[in-house]
Amino acid sequence: MAGRDIVRSLQDLTNLDWNERASSSGTAGTYLKARTGSGSRLIYYKLPRYNGVVIDSYECVNELLASRLMDALGIEHLAYRLIHAKVLIDGAEYETWLNSSRNFRKVGERKLSLGAFFDLYKEPGEFPMEFCRRFGWQEDIARMMLIDYLMANRDRRASNIEVLAAPDGSFRIAPIFDTGFSLLAPLAGDLERITAFDPLADVATTNFVGSRSLEENLRTVAPVEGVKDLDEARIAEPFDGLEGILSDVALLKMREIIQRRWARYEEIRADR
């Protein structure tokens, strides 16, 4: 599977202006963003977590893994590339791994967060999950909850789900994006904690639509329609080409997390 979605040769991206800064729930540090081009040529760049001293590459590797895993599952998503690059931040040069992605909006579409859309169109007493069902998005949300469970994603707040508004007045849920704060990202490369991490731990998540429990959310929507099954080989494929980017210990644990969680999903699905 390794190919055009990983750029190993060092790229000089010191010309990028990292003028967009965002913090993610539960993280220590800032995520820096940049962009080039416009319209169909618009490219977004995203650095992993930066605390003013070091850059942690885990989130960007996770975005690529999630992108590849959703390819295997047949889930619509934003495609990410993983790029080895030199960047300039606050006058200091860093060598790191970062993500790039393209604009997923069609011509004339506007985007707004699901939270903002909910505030505009919700009915009295309506909860986000009920709201999404009313708009016919229940299968989109179910597929999102499946990938969030498999990736142990801790951050699916309202701004990490977008609605796209077309000129004809119709709306659709945007392809899934921002799955980086997942797997081992919160452990910041601590090998002792990585080794000890329970692959089935019900990690708390910030989730606008569901609860703080990823497994509870999955049980609510299982069985998930419109996804392909995984086996050991198809789970291994997304890790192609990642050798040397993260430690072998981390990559093996990440693969174990996805394998064990898919097996748990199969158990949940079989009980329905």
Residue ranges and their predicted role:
Residues 9-14, 107-119, 222-241:
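Short, solvent-exposed coil/turn linker segments
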Residues 80-88, 158-167, 271-272:
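Short alpha-helical "patches" and their helix-cap loops
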Residues 2-112:
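Conserved ATP-binding subdomain of kinase catalytic cores across diverse folds
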Residues 91-95, 100-145, 269:
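ATP-dependent phospho-/nucleotidyl transfer catalytic cores
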Residues 73, 168-272:
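C-terminal catalytic region of ATP-dependent kinase domains
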Residues 1-21, 62, 134, 169, ...:
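Regulatory N- and C-terminal appendages and interdomain linkers associated
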